[in-house]
């Protein structure tokens, strides 16, 4: 037997190391090499001496290429210079300069007028040979470019880089079309299919991947080999791909992805591959020598001698069946030319869309005659059969060609399955017989058939193993002939065939162009084939119309259908809409008739048990909560059409009462507030931790009218009765032992306040620790009842400034203590509030209220009551946001009776801020809380009143102060105010830290209820987060629109109008690494954006702005200063005038920045360091 691969010759090519090599594709007899000796040598295969040595480079040659006519030679050097030679005239034609680093890849355009070059500077350049210059530069790779290929029609250029990415560029539009990112190593080789719109890529990650260039999908991948891929080349017939590895040669078919053969070659660094006259030529290099390697394709599967002999045998057998086979072929021939780029409609080249019995012609030729078609099928060894044969079955083991691997999928990344290769059903009788023989051979294994199956299996083994025809017995040929004759006879359909849908299974591809959508692939396990028969009956993804009959006028028999289903078992591709049914039949060995339910969640079809999306987890969490609600005992359900108004009183236990929660309210100028006749009970122990101030922001023009009910608390051993009556007054408290002054807080929010409401009630129930929430007010009220311990009513004091009027009609609040009585009757004008405290206390749970001004809330008849259930133990009080609008009228009618046991904790003070002309309605929700003995700190969410929007407030986004001196003036007061507020925010962190430390000392109760709180918070803000991210994405797309048109000035102008600090920071962060594209004009446009970012609430935009300003001032600072300070020149100079205006604009912005920098310095950290650095740069003359 002749050698399958051998070395033809080896010789010294250069006086220094060889760096690159390329074979001419026209004659496949010439090749060129480039080395460190600055030369490009031209060679003829078989001759040890060079035909020509091309000089001219002054640095090492890193890349070489032939044009399609083998007349021009292109070479790129390590200096970035590209030189073009004419081989026929032996002279240099052009020299191109433009790359900043070594030119690592060059390639000629198919039509010869252009060329492409890639460099280690990550830029891809297109050059015009006639104009001697660069006409386009593509930037997108993050590392150097290693290989370049033009599409056969010259419309696109594809580049592979060291960043593991393959990018497709449109030369006509001058932009990036798509990028493939599934490789895990540098790209080393690219090749296009000669007949299909298909791209193959070889990488150092030891895999070859096949990409559909119509839909930009990954359609197949080889399994990782032992070594990396160096060079790949499609066979001219398009059936197979020859893959040159570091030390061997592999032959793959791409549909399906099957490794047919492997040859150990022994070459070193493979430079290029070429196929000519049935021979595979490979040129490799090592140091300064070059080796030429030859492999006889006729000795390699699937082009081996055995395949040709079997072809002759099959032609004899099928000569009598040509007419029948031809009649059954109804489909059009497969497209054998490059697709038309002008058509906008994407045609799927892998789906046979014809009616009737589908049949697809082979890629290697046309379907001129049935004999030719079947001959090709025999020569190709029917790739469908290869994928059908299970590797664990007897057929695969007995075959001498058992080294073949049927690769249906592989993993490119953890957890990601590739789509299986696509299968084309060949309609010839020969292929049907082979499928039947596969099924028969498999049934023999189960003991369902007899001697006839043995003969058929032996015939199939003979074909697969590549034995010569004389090795096969006449009985084998007779058995195959008998099989064809039986197939031609009309047969009555079986019962199973009648009940089944009778259309051959067809491979379907998802229309989506995104690879990462849901796709499920079947495996090739032989053990699962028997279950497919049962699963196929109920499978809905087959899309088989009933009543389909073949050309003989009868339905196909059950055996034919079963064989077809088995043949398509391992290759069928499911679209996302049908994935659930297929997975059900695959995962259940018994062939369950029920398909998995596919439910739609927010417009996305989700397969239960497979997809773990965030939305599904939220939905599942809600279901669990509702299921637990059935076990709850105390629930309060109100009808959506009626609102009950009745006082609610919690059980009063004579233990110890927790102090009321104080919520200070600050009223600025011209505040008209009717009510605050507020009886306040404030009892604290002597040693207390500082209270935490939680802000409440109310917008302008808020009408405020409160009628606060009395609060009664009973404690053993200590009694205090306080009666407060205020008319523009503060509150004072007397006690016997030790008093500590509290902030000015004359407004009280009681947790048992009853309000009229059009909204339905919301009931929340816990087993053993119940909290019934009843909303019976115009906004909503909360009733939370728990066992043994109750949290006190929140008290919301108000600081009254100029022109503030408060009238109160509330009865006094009486608190009785047996041993230490203290009665106080106060009437004061803006007097301080005094509170009594007790030692070691933990903050009490707070029910926040969210107030909105200009939106009316009315849920009386539209929203049903909501009942939610929680686990047994809770560590914090449930936070219930309540929405208030301006038009709401509130009446407080519910008293509060609350009791608390042993250990008490002080209430957190929640300051409320009212701006000018605020009239605020009462919004106290009725709350009755009963808690168990040990209480942990409660989560607190503050209250916010917005002017025009109904937004859930977060503590981090609420501004509770307006602190800046009115005497301070600045060119940008808005930014200055923001910076001032943020600086003051930083100073309050030290005060809050003590609260946090005290909070940590308290016992923390953790359990499933904490997770429940987290889920509720996430669910509450989920849609808002999605809307925010969608808004940012839209804004970024606007900027990208200008960016893709290379309109940087337009992108910056759009960025100024967006006024979104997050988007601005993202774009400027990118510009920070591309300062070379910025000019003085762009700096003047960008400076206002940078100034605005300095007023951001978060650190990242400020850091990005400071970093960008440092770089820009370092580049343009001197120019701006010299231009602004220069004397005016007599005469007219338009360019000088324009430059002066730009510099004056930049100087004005830098002065604004310089005034803000001292405030940023106070914030400390990285911001302070950069601010000081920028301040020094700006102050330098």
From Swiss-Prot:
Residues 530-553, 569-585, 998-1008 have a biased composition (Basic and acidic residues). GO terms for cellular component: Cul4-RING E3 ubiquitin ligase complex; cytoplasm; katanin complex; microtubule; microtubule cytoskeleton. WD repeats lie at residues 13-53, 56-95, 98-137, 140-181, 183-221, 224-264, 266-303. GO terms for biological process: microtubule severing; regulation of unidimensional cell growth; response to abscisic acid; response to salt stress. A motif (DWD box) lies at residues 114-130. It is found in: Cytoplasm, Cytoskeleton. Keywords: Cytoplasm, Cytoskeleton, Microtubule, Repeat, WD repeat. InterPro entries: G-protein_beta_WD-40_rep, Katanin_C-terminal, KTNB1, WD40/YVTN_repeat-like_dom_sf, WD40_repeat_CS, WD40_repeat_dom_sf, WD40_rpt. Gene3D superfamilies: YVTN repeat-like/Quinoprotein amine dehydrogenase (2.130.10.10). Disruption phenotype: Hyper-induction of abscisic acid (ABA)-inducible transcription factors (e.g. ABI5 and MYC2) and their downstream genes in response to ABA. Increased sensitivity to ABA and salt stress leading to reduced root length and increased dehydration tolerance. Residues 361-383, 503-597, 702-739, 754-869, 988-1008 are annotated as: Disordered. GO terms for molecular function: microtubule binding. Expressed at low levels in siliques, flowers, leaves, stems and roots. The keyword Ubl conjugation does not apply. Residues 365-379, 509-526, 703-739, 754-791, 822-841, 850-859 have a biased composition (Polar residues). May participate in a complex which severs microtubules in an ATP-dependent manner. Microtubule severing may promote rapid reorganization of cellular microtubule arrays. Confers precision to microtubule (MT) severing by specific targeting of KTN1 to MT cleavage sites such as crossover or branching nucleation sites. Together with other KTN80s, regulates cell elongation by modulating MT organization. Negative regulator of abscisic acid (ABA) responses. May function as a substrate receptor for cullin-RING ubiquitin ligase 4 complexes (CRL4), a family of E3 ligases involved in protein degradation. Belongs to the WD repeat KATNB1 family. Component of KTN80-KTN1 complexes composed of a hexamer of KTN1-KTN80 heterodimers that sense microtubule (MT) geometry to confer precise MT severing. Interacts directly with AAA1/KTN1. Interacts with subunits of the CUL4-based E3 ligase complex DDB1A and DDB1B. This is Katanin p80 WD40 repeat-containing subunit B1 homolog KTN80.2. It comes from Arabidopsis thaliana.
